[in-house]
Amino acid sequence: MGEISQEAVERYLEKNPCFAKEYFDKKLRVEALGVIFKNSHAGVQTGLSLPEMTQVEESAVCLELLQCMQDEAGSAEQMAHRALQRLAQLLQADCCSMFSCRARNGIPEVASRLLNVTPTSKFEDNLVAPDREVVFPLDIGIVGWVAHVKKALNVSDVKKNSHFSDFMDKQTGYVTRNLLAVPIVAGKEVLAVVMAVNKISAPEFSKQDEEVFSKYLSFVAVALRLQHTSYLYSVESRRSQILMWSANKVFEELTDVERQFHKALYTIRTYLNCDRYSIGLLDMTKEKEFYDEWPIKLGEVEPYKGPKTPDGREIIFYKIIDYILHGKEEINVIPSPPADHWTLVSGLPTYVAENGFICNMLNAPADEYFTFQKGPVDETGWVIKNVLSLPIVNKKEDIVGVATFYNRKDGKPFDEHDEHITETLTQFLGWSLLNTDTYERVNKLESRKDIAQEMVMNLTKATPDEISSILKFKEKLNVEVIEECEERQLLAILKEDLPDPRTADLYEFCFSDFPITEHELVKCGLRLFLEINVVEKFKVPVEVLTRWMYTVRKGYRPVTYHNWRHGFNVGQTMFTLLMTGRLKKYYTDLEAFAMLAAAFCHDIDHRGTNNLYQMKSTSPLARLHGTSILERHHLEYSKTLLQDESLNIFQNLNKRQFETVIHLFEVAIIATDLALYFKKRTMFQKIVDTCEQMQSEEETIKYVTSDPTKKEVIMAMMMTACDLSAITKPWEVQSQVALLVANEFWEQGDLERTVLQQQPIPMMDRSKKDELPKLQVGFIDFVCTFVYKEFSRFHGEITPMLNGLQNNRVEWKSLAEEYEAKVKVTEEEAGKQEEEASDGKAATDLGGSAEDKKSKTCLML
């Protein structure tokens, strides 16, 4: 058989189409498509037409495109490039291009990514470098329009299309006649626009071309969506890492804004995806000092005419922190940066500080508005390319600084996702300033408190003259300053001048302070400490003890009842319960020392009003302490005195002993809140019941002292018994004290009526003062009787207090009955008068005058 020519084969195939179909169904898939799709550099005969290609099964083409996706899984651009090569061949287009869609500064735009892809072009030649991108908004060109409407567009003659722009043609010298553009969409977001340009074998792209283009671009869409999803995952991962680490570092540093920013920004540097970033911190001064304004007002200095922040501050960057991430990591801090520093010379940070805008700039050195440095900014040779600048705004919406990020690491410009990440960061940093501001305010308040405390202490602390009025060292030792005296000499002098405890009835439950001056009461208080033998045992400096005692006296305000006399009486009763009542056997000397001192301080700085009034008037004390308001204030005042070494009577105790004293102060003073009395009295009653059944004193002591809680419950009830002890005094004393208490209550009632505009309760209503005996009887029955009855059961030595209480109840009951009798007589007389008045009215109605009996409506003639 002779050699068959090519022409003969073509003629045979044309005359036998059925044979040709069978042959190509078997052979073309492997031989022809293998050359077309697998070898990007293989030449394909240009005469191969679409009808000829569509004779091949479409599944084979899909398989080849999937193989391309698998081979180029690492780069969506490379996969898209290979697909565009094949589409250019299939559609018989002169070339294909792909434009990516993004947004900057809130404005969507398209940018060239792959340009002029042909069946034989190389990827490197078609890929557009980030610094050579052609970028234009969506209102320019057909590509922008397709991205805007998100629909494919087949333009047969571009000159007749109103959306066509010849911008690209002028740039490249290319002539566009017709084109087919299709958007690639993920949800509602356009990722890219792919375009086929200039149909070769026809004047325009056909409907069949549109179908093929859209069909096979779905593979490109899958690759781009995968890449976009991966990018979004990276964005969210970076955002969460930035927030987590910045929060971690922000709360590590609360004292200084600069250190707070630096710790946060340095820690998150790896997640910012840029070569370099800088933070400019703004001066927060809103008003100049008066002496800084003098030169301006006198004309010696020109007034500031530069830009200002939205809140009116002069834009002055007092510090720049420059973070270098390219090459060797480095941090530069530039205090008081000059205006020509490369971070400021462009004017962008100033513009952002003035307007509060986010500025995302592509190819920043070419910008005409801002003057960025076009060459290297420093000796590293680093050059500015892309810039993203944002304001740092605090919770008050004041701009406190400007953060500027330079050159995204992948070379691309910063996009909207970078804007969101950095905006999240700057917002968090701005809001975190609330921590440092709060810390600063707290520090200032603490300083003001310390100053106020010092001022108050200066007024209340016993002066040297007041101390010498009790410790007469000048007269006795003939020295001018107390520091020249020895401790034993001062103690001897003090013992000589203090009153005799028996003569002053300090051991008696019936003690009365009325015959004694307030100054002498200070001496009596000092005597009580000497009587319990704690001064020498715990090495209490005599001068310190005297100063503390006198200062406690001055700490009590001159109110009607809760004054120094009441404070002393409570201290004296505590002493009497311990010594005369023999409760001291349950407590150590240190505990007795603390209990006596706490009793003297229990109402220090009382305002003459109760806790309820503090809450009603929303006083600072009520805002500071939620419960037991005044008691907690008395406790804090007492602890404040002990913080001053010259007043700390416990200064020679060890740490553990001092902690014990403070705890006992807390228990004792808070226990004087009567609101807590009803909670503790059941516990106390159980202790008394148990002790009453004990066979010996030793057994009782062991039972009580073995449990610190029992000792605290007893101590708390002792404080209540001391606080209410005026109700147990002899009648001539108790009746006067009751009037003092009542007067203080009435004064509070007057305040409630005038200041708070509220009606006081009967106990504090001055208009119901005649009901005082009845109220006293109720108070004795409801509150007091239990306390002294149980203490009498607990220790028989305390029975005199119960007897005094019962005697006073008889007196108050008698007065209450007298008052009730008077009220009854008054009511009876008022009733009789009403009856007489009503009887007289009835008689008048029945036996009226003749004139009254005449009818006013009918006249008899």
Curated annotation (Swiss-Prot):
Highest taxon in the source lineage: Eukaryota
Q: Which residues does the Swiss-Prot or TrEMBL record annotate as the active site?
A: H562
- Any one GO BP annotation for this protein: phototransduction, visible light
- Cofactor: how and how many bound: Binds 2 divalent metal cations per subunit. Site 1 may preferentially bind zinc ions, while site 2 has a preference for magnesium and/or manganese ions.
Catalytic activities? 3',5'-cyclic GMP + H2O = GMP + H(+)
InterPro entries according to UniProt? GAF (IPR003018), GAF-like_dom_sf (IPR029016), HD/PDEase_dom (IPR003607), PDEase (IPR023088), PDEase_catalytic_dom (IPR002073), PDEase_catalytic_dom_sf (IPR036971), PDEase_CS (IPR023174)
Gene Ontology cellular-component terms listed = plasma membrane
Q: Name one GO molecular function term.
A: cGMP binding
Enzyme class name: hydrolase
Cell compartments where the protein resides: Cell membrane
> Main localisation, per the record?
membrane
Q: Has the keyword Repeat been applied to this entry? A: yes
Q: Give the bilayer topology.
A: Lipid-anchor
Q: Where is this region: Disordered?
A: 826-861
Q: Which residues are covalently lipidated (S-geranylgeranyl cysteine)?
A: C858
Basic and acidic residues: compositionally biased ranges:
826-839
For 3',5'-cyclic GMP, which residues are the binding ones? S97, N116, D169, K170, Q171, T172, T176
The protein's Enzyme Commission number: 3.1.4.35
Stretches assigned to coiled coil: none
Q: Which family does it belong to?
A: Belongs to the cyclic nucleotide phosphodiesterase family.
How does this polypeptide assemble, per the annotation? Composed of two alpha' subunits that are associated with 3 smaller proteins of 11, 13, and 15 kDa.
This protein's name: Cone cGMP-specific 3',5'-cyclic phosphodiesterase subunit alpha'
Organism source for this protein?
Mus musculus
Q: What is the lineage of its organism?
A: Eukaryota, Metazoa, Chordata, Craniata, Vertebrata
